[in-house]
Amino acid sequence: MKKIEMYHHKKVLVLGLARSGVSAATIMHKLGAFVTVNDQKPFSENPEAQGLLEQGIKVICGSHPIELLDEGFELVIKNPGIPYNNPMIEKALKLKIPVITEVELAYQISEAPIVGITGTNGKTTTTTIIHHMLNAHKENSSLLAGNIGFPASAVAENATSDQYISMELSSFQLMGVETFKPHISVITNIYEAHLDYHTDRSEYVQAKWHIQKNQTADDFLVINWDQEELKNLTKQTKAQVIPFSTTQRLGQGSYVQNGNIMFNDEVIGARDNILLPGEHNLENVLASVAVAKTLGVTNEEIMHVLETFKGVEHRTQFVVEWQGRKFYNDSKATNILATQSALKGFKNPVVLLAGGLDRGNSFDELLPFFKNVKALIVFGETADKIGRVGKIAGIDVHYVDNVEAAVPVAYRESAPGDIILLSPACASWDQYRTFEVRGNAYMDAIGELIEEVEK
């Protein structure tokens, strides 16, 4: 970890805990800052806060008292899930207190260069593929961080200059960066999302675009050339642009030609040898290839990963085949486009489990993708909205309380040869703390169903 002096004796408020808040508070404490942590969860139910108190860090739990900001803080590090219209954040900004997210701290202390990956969809898969490719080239040369793996600052604390940090980054995290500068930035795609958090689409796009704002001509920006919006934005960057495309023969960057994955007119390997199915995963593969080739990974090492990588947990993850049905866990489908992509990947009849946090979408965009859906099980805040679209499509719709209750209904409505797919098209936060918790609840419910039926 870089021994930076700028935080020594600085009065810092860490707002919101979870993993990233705990990491930020611990590191700030080590750097000599006077740290106060504020979290809404009551102290008695908050083991993270209890652990920080044992380190000598001041902890305030149970609410976010607005008057706390009158205590002369010089910096606020906020949990990325706390929106900028939160009263605490609004007051901090009004008082001209700098507000950052934990990834900014990670960059400041990191000795390792960062490969930062963002986008509406595909960032987890792309980050993971890049991580595997770099490690195939040189063992332990990549560390996973961000939304996947460990908090960015915790990884940065222990990373060395001969490693890379492969860091998945959300728009929430990128809104709070000032000096953050990845050596390689990746933008997989941009679609409409998180409009409950961002004021409008423009703010969302700009948050994603922040990933490259401090890059120089010595850095690289890997970007989806099939999206005109992103293509036009590249006129504003100082980084070297490396395009990728699933539809165009580019001649530079990564693309597909004559059934082969290409990079700068060089054949990397046959597309048919890639284990990951689906057009959406081709985007992820091409973005990963562009990064890997830029960092010196050989074609053989790249193809070894692509021929063996089965995908990311909770992302169209095959769970089990039982009673002739195949169960898939796509809990990470937290927006409509991700569910569209999942449905496109199946030819057999699908029993779809969907629903979750209401962000104001109508879900009409799912209608053309319901051709293969034979039954729809809905839950959460958006149950009525998604159910309405199912009824328009002429699908049998069943309303249940949660994912766990959806599994036995899905089994009852299915037949041998069918796909049972959890692909919610919504964030999990109305009922589950994370999409991982939701996905695990689904897989646990499948296990309980099998046990019950086979008694």
Swiss-Prot record:
It comes from the Bacteria. Its main location: cytoplasm. ATP binds at G119, T120, N121, G122, K123, T124, T125. It is an enzyme of class 6 (ligase). The gene is murD. InterPro entries: Folylpolyglutamate_synth_CS (IPR018109), Mur-like_cat_sf (IPR036565), Mur_ligase_C (IPR004101), Mur_ligase_C_dom_sf (IPR036615), Mur_ligase_cen (IPR013221), MurD (IPR005762). GO terms for cellular component: cytoplasm. The keyword Nucleotidyltransferase does not apply. This is UDP-N-acetylmuramoylalanine--D-glutamate ligase.
